[in-house]
């Protein structure tokens, strides 16, 4: 809105004051939201670093355990045990709200199973296979948790950028333009008032 595009009337001046007040209120709320989202992001980033370290450790552990199991039991036994495993883990995708941003919550409590619920026979298999399965169940849990956290971080980053753009638009474009238009109308009304006063004085003198 250019200053010269507005009508220099008192009603327009009142309307502009309302718009400025509303824009300033919105600007304040958006800044609070942006700052809150940034704090949330860095809090989750700290957790993400821990989870990433845990994921790397779980991956290394799983590789070691499966290597030991293969060397003791043989690859064929490991494969037949894997094929005997029953029921893929139930993954339930839910969501929750962080300052207006909907982020995923993945429920994966069924990943870890008791030994007697895994599907392969307990007789004829050693504890090395059980340990390998344990380590891979742990790895899957870490992968799911890492996916949840990284998706949350991406969504928060997207919303932080969107909120920053809105804050900047209000701060550097909308509010300055409205203020400029308000000042223009004020000055124009004062000028018109002086002209009217001068005109009335001339009429009285005449």
Swiss-Prot record:
Gene Ontology, cellular component aspect: plasma membrane
Underlying gene: atpD
Pfam annotation, one family: ATP-synt_D
Compartments in which it is found: Cell membrane
Family matches, as PANTHER family: V-TYPE ATP SYNTHASE SUBUNIT D
Membrane topology type: Peripheral membrane protein
Keyword Ubl conjugation applies: no
GO molecular function terms attached to this record: ATP binding; proton-transporting ATP synthase activity, rotational mechanism; proton-transporting ATPase activity, rotational mechanism
Disulfide bonding pattern of the chain: none
Swiss-Prot/TrEMBL keywords: ATP synthesis, Cell membrane, Hydrogen ion transport, Ion transport, Membrane, Transport
Gene3D superfamilies per UniProt: 1.10.287.3240
Function: Component of the A-type ATP synthase that produces ATP from ADP in the presence of a proton gradient across the membrane.
GO term, biological process aspect, one: proton motive force-driven plasma membrane ATP synthesis
Official protein name in the record: A-type ATP synthase subunit D
Assembly mode: Has multiple subunits with at least A(3), B(3), C, D, E, F, H, I and proteolipid K(x).
Family to which this protein belongs: Belongs to the V-ATPase D subunit family.
NCBIfam families the record matches: PRK00373.1-1, PRK00373.1-4, V_ATPase_subD
Keyword Ion transport: yes
InterPro entries reported for this sequence: V_ATPase_D (IPR002699)
């Amino acid at each position: 809105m250019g200053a010269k595009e507005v009508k220099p009337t008192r009603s327009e001046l009142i309307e502009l004051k309302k718009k400025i007040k509303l824009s300033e209120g919105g600007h304040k709320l958006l800044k609070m939201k942006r700052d809150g989202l940034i704090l949330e992001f860095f809090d989750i980033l700290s957790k993400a670093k821990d989870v990433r370290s845990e994921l790397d450790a779980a991956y290394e552990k799983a590789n070691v355990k499966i290597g030991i199991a293969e060397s003791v039991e043989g690859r064929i036994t490991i494969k037949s045990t894997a094929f005997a495993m029953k029921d893929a883990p139930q993954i339930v995708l839910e969501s929750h709200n962080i300052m207006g941003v909907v982020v995923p919550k993945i429920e994966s409590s069924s990943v870890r199973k008791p030994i007697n619920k895994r599907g392969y026979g307990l007789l004829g298999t050693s504890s090395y296979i059980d340990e390998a399965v344990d380590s891979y169940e742990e790895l899957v849990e870490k992968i799911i948790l890492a996916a949840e956290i990284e998706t949350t971080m991406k969504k928060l980053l997207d919303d932080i950028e969107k909120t920053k753009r809105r804050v900047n638009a209000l701060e550097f474009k909308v509010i300055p333009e409205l203020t400029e238009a308000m000042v223009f109308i004020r000055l124009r009304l004062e000028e018109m008032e002086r002209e009217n006063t001068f005109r009335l004085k001339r009429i009285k003198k005449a």
